[in-house]
Amino acid sequence: MAKAIMLQGTSSNVGKSVLAAALCRIFHRNGYRVSPFKSQNMALNSGATPDGGEMGRAQIVQAMAAGVVPRVEMNPILLKPTAHASSQVIVLGRPVGNLGAREYHGHFNQKLWSRVEEAYAFLEREFEIIVIEGAGSPAEINLKAGEIANMRVARMAGAPVLLVADIDRGGALAAVVGTLELLEPEERVMVAGIIINKFRGDLDLLKPALDFLESRTGKPVLGVIPFLPDHGLPEEDSVVLEGVTGRSTGAGEVEIAVIKLPCISNFTDFDALEREKGVNLRYVEAASDLGNPDLVILPGSKNTIGDLLWLRCQGLETAIKELAGRGTPIIGICGGYQMLGKEIRDPEHVETDVEMIKGLDLLPIKTVFQTSKATNQVRGVVTGSGPFLGPLQGQEVQGYEIHMGASFLLDGRPAFKITSRGGRLVTLDDGALAGEGRIWGTYIHGILDNDSLRHQVISVLRARRGLPARPGMLNFMAEQERRLDILAGEVARHLDLGRLAAIMGLERPLVWTGHDN
């Protein structure tokens, strides 16, 4: 039977996902077969497994940290918000419908508990250690009766719980004490320790507070993890984009503007771009903030028609088309690709009651939404022309697709040709081009994770500014692995690994054996 440890938080966004990834890497480096698990995840950042299932991006990264192939059992329930108080429900990698919050939490989630149990039982048979991540807070009284993500999961797994608090936002001690007070006595016993996360400052000054916390709660503080703003791992949800609107995420010589759609999804598509030196990437949700960037990207969306209407109301459609008319490059990914076309049809009301809407008319495609959903890992080759794709013709790219509907090319050549979809050999066109190749779009998420393509995009933007190509550009996959080791090393140095091993009943001590420099 697998050993388990569960991370629960005093609230959302306290850093559970990142700490879970760190623990997965620590256990992996100690020679254990380890798997992540999150029973229910609400996020718009998702990915495709090798067998074509959809799961939360955070658990995919945690699986990478654990050195294993991601499986939908690691995240059996995924909720993807489509509008206010409504979400698409994904169960074991497949969509089962859209539900409102009241309907889902009222009774539907209880029907899914057996799927959670089955998924965990599978992982328990396959792995030695399971790192479980909770959702939100275990003390949400209004949802507690029907919750399937926190203490109920801990009981099922027999997992000791570590309660994580974010001290950077303030009130961490009160959050810990308050959370424990609101738990039932039998739940409180399950909490084996406390982790204070995102600390910056003098630890000696914090020590009296830690002593108080241990005395007041009777729970040991297993570690104080430093604030790690540059951990470089994909973030789970768009809450991390709050406060960055209209501002740059860094300084650089070329400027890229990503439109921050209300239902933006898979903004992890831009993680590699943000990591490149000399790139200034910023998120924009007002026409007045768009300015004159070197490149505009329309990202994926969980509500393409709704976000297109928003784009129009904000004046961003006009601003983007004016930039395109002046020669500014435009890229669309998935929902953003659909928006760049001539029109979008939704005859079966997959997204909204709007059956047809005009697009930005910057790409020669028409899109028709369908009830079936494509979720696949894909490989293909570049077929497009123009400055961005022309020099790469014939080169292989890879990524994944997650979309409902199909786009039909009306003129010109496709940007890519898919040669493998979900492990099956295929020959399928993907994407479109216009404006002599300056404007292009694709359904392939992660397209900019491909080093050669991303480097070509940046080199073209630099050349348009009269700047030389930058040597030594990023190897994104190697960088992700390096940053996982750095993260795990930082957590290992500030966490009592001996006490953690004892809490879990491990037979051998935990040490850090990674390469974190």
Curated annotation (Swiss-Prot):
Record InterPro entries: Class_I_gatase-like (IPR029062), CobQ/CobB/MinD/ParA_Nub-bd_dom (IPR002586), CobQ_GATase1 (IPR033949), CobQ_N (IPR047045), CobQ_synth (IPR004459), GATase_3 (IPR011698), P-loop_NTPase (IPR027417)
Q: In which pathway does it act?
A: Cofactor biosynthesis; adenosylcobalamin biosynthesis
**Keywords annotated in UniProt:** Cobalamin biosynthesis, Glutamine amidotransferase
Known role:
Catalyzes amidations at positions B, D, E, and G on adenosylcobyrinic A,C-diamide. NH(2) groups are provided by glutamine, and one molecule of ATP is hydrogenolyzed for each amidation.
Source organism lineage? Bacteria, Bacillati, Bacillota, Clostridia, Moorellales
Q: Where is the GATase cobBQ-type domain?
A: 253-453
Output the Gene Ontology terms for molecular function. Answer: ABC-type vitamin B12 transporter activity; catalytic activity
Give me any GO biological process, just one.
Answer: cobalamin biosynthetic process
Q: Which NCBIfam families match?
A: cobQ (TIGR00313), PRK00784.1 (NF001989)
Similarity remark? Belongs to the CobB/CobQ family. CobQ subfamily.
Pfam families, per this entry?
CbiA, GATase_3
Q: Which protein, by its recorded name, is this?
A: Cobyric acid synthase
Q: Where is the active site?
A: C334, H445
Q: Which Gene3D superfamilies match?
A: 3.40.50.880, P-loop containing nucleotide triphosphate hydrolases
